[in-house]
Amino acid sequence: MKAEATVIPSRCARGLPSWQVLSPVQPWQTSAPQNTTQPKLLAPHQHEKSQKKSSLLKELGAFHITIALLHLVFGGYLASIVKNLHLVVLKSWYPFWGAASFLISGILAITMKTFSKTYLKMLCLMTNLISLFCVLSGLFVISKDLFLESPFESPIWRMYPNSTVHIQRLELALLCFTVLELFLPVPTAVTAWRGDCPSAKNDDACLVPNTPLHLKGLPVEPPPSYQSVIQGDAQHKQHQRLREVKQVAPDTWIVTDGAAIWTQTAN
């Protein structure tokens, strides 16, 4: 009787690995990017640095305003008590236009902390430059009153001062405030110029460059070659267990399962 053989593959041969079932060059492997970029975000260290500069600019502006108010107070008091003395500092009205210059510089410096615009930055630089010239002019006129063309008869260190000595001491205090103002315009201008957030271009945000973000769970290696796929398929078939059934009689079959051979009957 002619034997009829049937080959039944085992369960382990029902499916191949996903990289063997698909073609060697997969679309998702070639088209999907291995890395992507994050959106532009505010860098923490740059944000902290920007906040420190803004705080410093605010403090410098507060010093400007304080010295301006002191100039107004001392200048107004000097103008009210001086009668017969010829003071260049009052004839030139330095305590008032100097105070106005310092006040505008301080207000612009504080405003830049809230509204960091390009035109405000330029205005702040210009007003601080003008304040520097005002300070130099004030030093000249006060020094002329106290040292060069002094209208005071008594020295400032007199033990029993009169009204003239009081005026001289007030002008000396005004000189001290002017010297303090001398150290403010340049740091204020530099801090305003080196600000990191020129909001006219990036809407008040300091942005960092795009950085690569590696996606987890996606393959980043190149696709396997055709030879490696064929070799892997051959090795898989060698380990695959095949079942061969031969019918030797109407009710008898010989089953070969690779490792063993047995006979199976219909009963």
From Swiss-Prot:
One family name in Pfam for this protein: CD20
Membrane topology recorded in Swiss-Prot or TrEMBL: Multi-pass membrane protein
Cytoplasmic side: 1-61, 113-121, 193-267
GO CC aspect terms: plasma membrane
Transmembrane parts of this sequence: 62-82, 92-112, 122-142, 172-192
Keyword annotations from UniProtKB, A to Z: Membrane, Receptor, Transmembrane, Transmembrane helix
Recorded family membership: Belongs to the MS4A family.
Function (record text): May be involved in signal transduction as a component of a multimeric receptor complex.
Name of the protein in question: Membrane-spanning 4-domains subfamily A member 10
